[in-house]
A protein has these predicted regions:
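Active-site donor/metal-binding and catalytic loop motifs
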Residues: 174-193, 202
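Active-site nucleotide-sugar/metal-binding loop of Leloir-type enzymes
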Residues: 54-67
């Protein structure tokens, strides 16, 4: 793929965390690329989170986006993060199908200060939850399939996709590009135990174990040899 400018889609499912979602949108800056935001109104239609991700990706693909960022509504960018991230991923081989930035929350007294930082800021990089903010190319779904929409309302869909990526022989890469994840601001307000158990049970049915270390009992969904890791049955 050539040099920028690229068309970049930013997919943000929003359930109940409106203030921080607005902060996230405020923080999303680009000087070198074209950015379009795709709000997924979970506050109106409570879809599984994975379905909201898929819908946002489809909208971005329809609009011709080259790269798609999927972000939790409790995350923040530095002003230069998106351009640096797109530039880095545009240089990767096709084997790197998903990339992520690194959390720099320990750098600041107040998380929102990241929006006033620049490339000379001495960030303290820390690994956080991988799928709180990720970037894929527009052809990601062709290589890895869509996110499994059976995880309802959420939980485990990220473990599922990470395992699928591994089974398919692809890789994930993290960059020293800054972002902040405030952490579980939306799911905190959900009734976790019952829903989380339900999603975990589905993961167990699908993969035969719940190790979550990229080594599960089954190598094909539901132990069905006619399926590939890209597949899931609604």
């Amino acid at each position: 793929m050539g040099n920028s400018p690229f068309k970049v889609g930013l997919v943000i499912p929003i359930l109940n965390n409106f203030d921080q979602a607005v902060d996230l949108i405020y923080s999303a800056k680009t000087k070198e690329n074209e950015l379009k935001v795709y709000i997924q109104p979970q506050y109106r239609y409570q879809l599984p989170l994975s379905q909201a991700w898929n819908n946002g990706m489809k909208q971005a693909i329809m609009d011709g986006c080259d790269y798609i960022i999927i972000a939790n509504d409790d995350t923040l960018f530095a002003p230069w993060s998106i351009d640096a991230w797109v530039s880095a991923m545009s240089k990767e081989s096709d084997n790197i199908v998903l990339t992520a930035p690194l959390h720099v929350g320990d750098t600041f007294d107040e998380p929102f200060e990241i929006v006033f930082s620049d490339e000379d800021t001495e960030y303290k990089y820390v690994e956080k939850e991988l799928f709180s903010m990720v970037m894929v190319r527009a052809d990601f779904w062709e290589k890895c399939g869509w996110f499994d929409e059976n995880f309802d309302p959420c939980w485990w869909e990220d473990n599922d996709m990470h395992y699928r990526i591994t089974l398919l022989g692809f890789n994930i890469k993290k960059y020293e590009i800054p972002y902040i994840h405030l952490g579980n601001q939306t799911t905190k307000k959900l009734t976790k135990p019952i829903n989380s158990i339900k999603s975990g049970e589905y993961y167990l049915k699908k993969w035969g174990s719940q190790n979550r270390n990229l080594i599960e009992r089954y190598k094909t969904p539901y132990n069905d040899s006619t399926l590939t890791p890209k597949d899931w049955i609604k």
